[in-house]
């Protein structure tokens, strides 16, 4: 059993990161792992990854299954249209999953196969830490990315002291743009490139005013967390990972 508001939030927070790869159907869905300690929802397309954890909905017996994107989208519409927060009963066997709430029953086939080992993709040692205003970063990336290369859609972060330089260029069109933002940065001077579309999708998914971005080297993934100094311990945790784009000199 899971509350409708929690389930709806879990779907919203993860579904945008699913892949549409015909070759790897597992990535076309959202992994749901239910344990005695809580529930984890994971989505990835190999460029970005979202791991959304809830400690307030656990089960007696561990189980995991991959939920397809289309039924989840439909389910989310039903959950959102229902104004009151209600309990959703989730039942599954090897091939199907069933959601029961109010007057609705939604049955869907599960995606066959084994989900990739997503924990192996999450780098553990990330000494370079950036804390910055989410809206300011989002707006800046949007503006600068207009001048990015059409093929890579790359924006470059140059971090030094408490300054973040965001830079993009399109050599074919002979255009470039740069903006400098104030930030709180602890770590070594570094340059790292990201796909602007993936990055703005991630930033759109952060609910807090500030965000924390952890990085190690330019060829390893960056990790984004919501950041709130005053926040109490909550029952939810979200980790978003974005793969870098190789820097073109």
How should these model regions be labeled?
Residues 1-249:
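Structural preference for solvent-exposed beta-strand-turn elements
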């Amino acid at each position: 059993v899971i509350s409708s508001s929690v389930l709806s939030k879990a779907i919203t927070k993860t579904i945008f990161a699913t892949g549409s790869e015909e070759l790897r159907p597992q990535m076309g869905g959202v992994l749901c792992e239910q344990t005695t300690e809580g529930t984890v929802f994971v989505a990835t397309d190999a460029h970005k990854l979202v791991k959304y954890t809830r400690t307030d909905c656990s089960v007696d017996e561990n189980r995991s299954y991959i939920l397809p994107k289309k039924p989840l989208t439909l389910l989310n519409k039903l959950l959102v249209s229902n104004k009151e927060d209600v309990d959703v009963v989730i039942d599954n066997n090897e091939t199907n999953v069933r959601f029961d709430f109010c007057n609705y029953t939604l049955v869907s086939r599960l995606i066959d196969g084994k989900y990739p080992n997503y924990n192996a993709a999450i780098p553990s040692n990330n000494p370079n830490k950036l804390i910055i205003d989410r809206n300011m970063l989002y707006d800046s990336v949007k503006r600068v990315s207009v001048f990015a290369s059409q093929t890579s859609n790359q924006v470059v972060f140059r971090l030094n002291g408490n300054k973040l330089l965001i830079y993009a260029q399109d050599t074919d069109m002979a255009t470039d743009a740069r903006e400098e933002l104030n930030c709180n940065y602890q770590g070594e001077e570094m340059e790292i490139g990201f796909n602007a579309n993936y990055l703005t999708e991630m930033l759109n998914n952060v609910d807090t005013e500030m965000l924390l971005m952890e990085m190690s080297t330019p060829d390893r993934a960056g990790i984004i967390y919501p950041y709130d100094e005053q926040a109490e311990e909550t029952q939810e945790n979200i980790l978003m990972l974005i793969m870098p784009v190789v820097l073109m000199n």
